[in-house]
Regions:
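Active-site-facing alpha/beta catalytic cores
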Residues: 66, 79-244, 265-270, 274-281, ...
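Redox- and metal-dependent alpha/beta enzyme cores, enriched for Fe-S-associated oxidoreductases
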Residues: 245-250
């Protein structure tokens, strides 16, 4: 086993001093965090949208998107609450490909994780301070959470990480909403065991110290579809899937039951335009069944400035990872959600 150090040990306090929220910007973030918590707890009946690019590969494109989203948020704020996806670390099935801003702060240059950490904080800071949007990120590397936990408002534990004990235990110490995706197998027990672990106190080693957490009552479920043994996607946003998920929630007696539908990934088969239909179908299911309306109160939507995806970062605001809805389709979908909720 050989590890070669490529930098001095990172000083967490020094990193956190960069791009620090203060004054009115901090106050605005804390206010929005309180609103988000009320939504997860069921005290606020607005629909939650965790929405934005699959990956945040270009700072200026992400900022342009954030400013448009902020304007739209103001128009729909009485029925819809949006947290912007600013995903800076991407899981790769075989380790190849673009791994996110934290690895590669410039998608056209060689990886540099030290500069990547600074870029991640700077981007979250700019979205919050310049656009007024609070942000979501994926906890791909649990040990990196202290580098950004003062900036983010929502955290997702992905399908490949949900069974990992370290991810579950670190999530139990987070003081913000944390969504657990079902694994790629579709096994709901794995997801619910993760939520249970995160909602309870845990003791473990973290960053070289023995720590104890309080438990995170804002941990909840994200349904993202599954893959069968032949690699075919199996959606799990259908009516029966939702009723099964609700039954499991009720059986386990978890706090603050809350279900988000991930409209892309294996629910859409990465056919990005399918996200629109999945939202529509879920809203119909909410109308049909009061339990679904009570439990299913959020969507995760992948969108950017331009429709689709590209292999290289050539078109401004077009994804270089999974395909996304472009801005025109995004705006139309959010307005449609808003109108449907008012009917």
């Amino acid at each position: 086993m050989v590890f070669t150090a490529k930098s001095p040990k990172i000083n967490i306090d020094e990193v956190r001093s960069l791009s620090k929220l203060e004054g009115q910007v901090l106050a605005n973030k804390l206010q929005r965090d309180q609103e988000l918590e009320a939504i997860i707890r069921g005290e606020d009946q607005r629909i939650l949208l965790v929405i934005g690019p699959c990956s945040s590969d270009n700072e200026e494109a992400v900022l342009e998107y954030a400013k448009r989203l902020s304007k739209l948020q103001e128009e729909v704020k009485d029925r819809v609450f949006m947290v912007m996806r600013v995903y800076t670390a991407k899981p790769r099935t075989n380790g190849d490909g673009y791994k996110g801003l934290i690895h590669q702060p410039n998608a056209k240059e060689a990886p540099s994780l030290i500069n990547g950490i600074k870029a991640v904080r700077h981007l979250h800071y700019r979205v919050i301070s310049e656009a007024g949007m609070t942000t979501a990120d994926e906890m791909l590397y649990p040990e990196n959470l202290p580098l950004v936990d003062d900036l983010i408002s929502y955290m997702a534990v992905g399908a490949r990480s949900v069974e990992d004990q370290q991810h579950r235990f670190v999530a139990s110490g987070a003081d913000f909403a944390t969504g657990f995706k079902n694994p790629t197998s579709g096994n709901l027990n794995v997801m619910f065991n993760g939520i249970y672990a995160a909602q309870n106190k845990q003791s473990f080693l973290f960053l070289g110290k023995e720590v104890e957490t309080t438990g995170n009552p804002l941990s909840h479920a994200i349904l993202r579809g599954a893959l069968n043994e032949y690699g075919k996607n199996i959606p799990n946003y259908y009516y029966d899937n939702l009723m099964d998920t609700i039954a499991q929630y009720e059986k386990m007696g978890l706090e603050n039951p809350f279900i988000i539908i991930d409209t892309n990934h294996d629910n859409s088969g990465k056919q990005y335009m399918e996200q629109i239909r999945i939202v529509r179908q879920t809203l119909i299911n909410r109308d049909w069944n009061e339990k679904i309306k009570k439990y299913v109160r959020g969507f995760m939507i992948e969108s950017y400035l331009e429709d689709g995806r590209q292999n290289e970062p050539e078109v401004f605001g077009k994804s270089i990872t999974d395909p996304c809805l472009g801005w025109e389709n995004t705006e139309a979908l959010v307005r449609e959600i808003y109108q449907r909720l008012g009917e």
